[in-house]
């Protein structure tokens, strides 16, 4: 699969994607309004952000009882984003089994031009038909290998090859839990670069659960990554994503060209994105436990909800979720864990 058709300005060293309006949806419990989306897209576009991702936190079709219902239908937000952006491309995420082929077609008709397809890092084969459709439709394609910390670099590279052969033009090492530490990122990115060569680019998506989102992104670029994700003001699941404004500041310092103006993106983060956030994304005990125990970042809000419902500590729920090696889509098992801890508490009292 050639990378010639990828949207990539020759002056860039890496292409940045802002995920505030997708990963940030987890933090906001999927309650974005049209006014918020329009304002954020306009600010990011003006700052020179090449790609802006817009969908429910769990991708196309994610609005559901299991994941949480959207305040505004995601397809309406994709259309609004595409109409608002003057230069930025609009990307959308889909997870096979959550979203459908028809969702991809509708997202494209609403102005989305980059289809990002995510699977668990050992299940790339479930994305084959979706990449095929996306390429048939003329969409640019990106693949997400989620929870990349759970398998070694050489196995991750084999999964990346499956995506690339199916039509994926850039495969991401996705640190869904914010659990990877420096060399762990570099080794995985380097393995993918060696495997894919010129067949596909390699990207990195980080979280701040151990406070390493920016540092890990730098490691990824130095290992050969050409696409990097972040969110303004860390607006994302868990402790949030690598903050775009900080990434741009650091990239400017070390000579990595992105085409994004540091001062404009800092203004966007402070004046436009921050007011749309229900609260700052914190590196608190819950987030740290997720990074330390390797828990999917979107579990945070679900764990807090079950903690309040059953009267058990959220950080204990998250730690046990890590011990059980739960992955995205298994959020409902937090209820079982909460009941288990509740029984243990009652037994200890008797």
From Swiss-Prot:
The record marks 22 as: Transition state stabilizer. PROSITE patterns: PYR_CT (PS50991). Residues 14-266 form the Pyruvate carboxyltransferase domain. CDD domains: DRE_TIM_HOA. Substrate binds at residues 22-23, 176, 205, 296. Keywords: Aromatic hydrocarbons catabolism, Lyase, Manganese, Metal-binding. The active site is at residue 26. GO terms for molecular function: 2-isopropylmalate synthase activity; 4-hydroxy-2-oxovalerate aldolase activity; manganese ion binding. It catalyses: (S)-4-hydroxy-2-oxopentanoate = acetaldehyde + pyruvate. Mn(2+) binds at residues 23, 205, 207. InterPro entries: 2-IPM_HCS-like (IPR050073), 4OH_2_O-val_aldolase (IPR017629), Aldolase_TIM (IPR013785), DmpG_comm (IPR012425), DRE_TIM_HOA (IPR035685), PYR_CT (IPR000891). SUPFAM superfamilies: Aldolase (SSF51569), post-HMGL domain-like (SSF89000). GO terms for biological process: catabolic process; L-leucine biosynthetic process. Its EC number is 4.1.3.39. Pfam families: DmpG_comm (PF07836), HMGL-like (PF00682). Belongs to the 4-hydroxy-2-oxovalerate aldolase family. This is 4-hydroxy-2-oxovalerate aldolase 3. It comes from Mycolicibacterium vanbaalenii (strain DSM 7251 / JCM 13017 / BCRC 16820 / KCTC 9966 / NRRL B-24157 / PYR-1).
